[in-house]
């Protein structure tokens, strides 16, 4: 999911952290095109679990633009749907707060790869990290497996995560 781009690093405890995820993802696609004839694949399945599923959603439209038969692409995700409510008694919408914070750090120079969704949420493009908001802008078929159980959410957004 951490596919954004931030030109300048963030210094954390004396170490520069670079956020160039979109460049890295595009370089992976370039490698597949050059070394594995990806453009002529007769079946492409993008998949991921939790944040990886969000990455698959985010990049599926881009992948369709670089293959000769866009209908050959399918997204199969295990989880990756963070429901918008105060999860397990948390004092606030933990998923929303986390996605907003992540987006404000890593998506400085670029928004998501989902242009249609970005246009639907001007100034609040972080909403596109949620399948609930980006679904209509994804052109590939999606098969959701275990969509309402996300192990990251269970472990990190529970009420115990917010105790003093």
Task: Place the predicted regions along the sequence by residue.
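C-terminal His-loop and adjacent cap/lid subdomain of alpha/beta-hydrolase
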Residues: 1-164
């Amino acid at each position: 999911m951490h596919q954004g781009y931030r030109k300048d690093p963030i210094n954390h405890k004396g170490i520069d952290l670079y956020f160039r995820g979109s460049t890295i993802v595009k370089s992976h696609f370039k490698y597949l095109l050059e070394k594995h004839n990806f453009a002529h694949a007769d079946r492409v399945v993008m998949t991921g679990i939790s944040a990886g599923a969000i990455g698959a959603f985010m990049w599926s439209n881009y992948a369709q633009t670089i293959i000769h038969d866009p209908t050959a692409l399918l997204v199969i995700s295990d989880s990756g749907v963070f429901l918008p409510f105060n999860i397990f008694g948390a004092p606030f919408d933990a998923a929303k707060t986390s996605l907003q914070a992540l987006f404000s750090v890593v998506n400085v120079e670029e928004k998501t790869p989902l242009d249609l969704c970005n246009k639907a949420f001007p100034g609040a493009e972080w909403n596109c990290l949620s399948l609930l908001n980006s679904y209509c802008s994804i052109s590939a078929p999606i098969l959701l497996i275990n969509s309402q159980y996300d192990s990251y959410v269970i472990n990190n957004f529970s009420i115990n995560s917010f105790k003093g």
